[in-house]
Swiss-Prot record:
It is found in: Plastid, Chloroplast thylakoid membrane. The chain crosses the membrane at residues 10-30, 32-52, 63-83, 92-112, 152-172. It comes from Dioscorea elephantipes (Elephant's foot yam). Keywords: Chloroplast, Membrane, NAD, NADP, Plastid, Plastoquinone, Quinone, Thylakoid, Translocase, Transmembrane, Transmembrane helix, Transport. It comes from the Eukaryota. It is a multi-pass membrane protein. GO terms for cellular component: chloroplast thylakoid membrane. NDH is composed of at least 16 different subunits, 5 of which are encoded in the nucleus. Its EC number is 7.1.1.-. This is NAD(P)H-quinone oxidoreductase subunit 6, chloroplastic. It catalyses: a plastoquinone + NADH + (n+1) H(+)(in) = a plastoquinol + NAD(+) + n H(+)(out); a plastoquinone + NADPH + (n+1) H(+)(in) = a plastoquinol + NADP(+) + n H(+)(out). NDH shuttles electrons from NAD(P)H:plastoquinone, via FMN and iron-sulfur (Fe-S) centers, to quinones in the photosynthetic chain and possibly in a chloroplast respiratory chain. The immediate electron acceptor for the enzyme in this species is believed to be plastoquinone. Couples the redox reaction to proton translocation, and thus conserves the redox energy in a proton gradient. Belongs to the complex I subunit 6 family. Its main location: plastid.
Length: 176
């Protein structure tokens, strides 16, 4: 979107706060259906971030794949889970909860320390005069493909493994 600087900044701050609230809704809501809808809202807000950074193809792919397919699959799997199986009232932490929280906290802090040190040379940024800065004249879709198969190959594969594990877990929970 070609917006003025202050309007763009206000939009990014608003989308970021809505994204954080939606993420908290995913984690903190007790009803699984509300949590799944909150996840859909988070994925929709991420696509709005892509639109605000002039990445329309990635935004459309985000809407179609994640909001349209993955979130519907998660809601479908959640609807098959009976409430009596998972409504135990024990609020005690187990060893798995502790291990999971340690792993997630370490990933969070490693991301916080890694992101500022990353060179973002391949990303197309827009300047204040709304001119797109590009090194070569290939389209955005080609740049995405080139970067996914060269620079971002390992993160792309790790994300696909995480998605595969989450889908296997959802199917396993739905069958039980």
């Amino acid at each position: 979107m070609d917006l003025l600087g202050p309007i763009h900044d206000i939009l990014v701050i608003f989308l970021g706060s809505v994204l954080i609230l939606g993420g908290l809704g995913v984690v903190l809501l007790n009803n699984l259906i509300y949590s799944a809808f909150s996840l859909g809202w988070v994925l929709f807000c991420i696509s709005l971030f892509y639109i605000s950074s002039n990445s329309y193809f990635v935004a459309a792919a985000q809407l179609l794949i994640y909001v349209g397919a993955i979130n519907v699959l998660i809601i479908f799997a959640v609807m098959f889970i009976s409430g009596s199986e998972y409504s135990n009232d024990s609020h005690l932490w187990t060893v798995g909860d502790g291990v999971t929280s340690v792993v997630c906290t370490s990933i969070f802090f490693s991301l916080i320390t890694t992101i500022p040190d990353t060179s973002w040379y391949g990303i197309i940024w827009t300047t204040r005069s709304n001119q797109i800065i590009e090194q070569d004249l290939i389209s955005n879709v080609q740049q995405i493909g080139i970067h996914l198969s060269t620079n971002f190959y390992l993160p792309f594969e790790l994300i696909s493994i995480i998605l595969l594990i989450s889908l296997i877990g959802a199917i396993t929970m739905a069958r039980q």
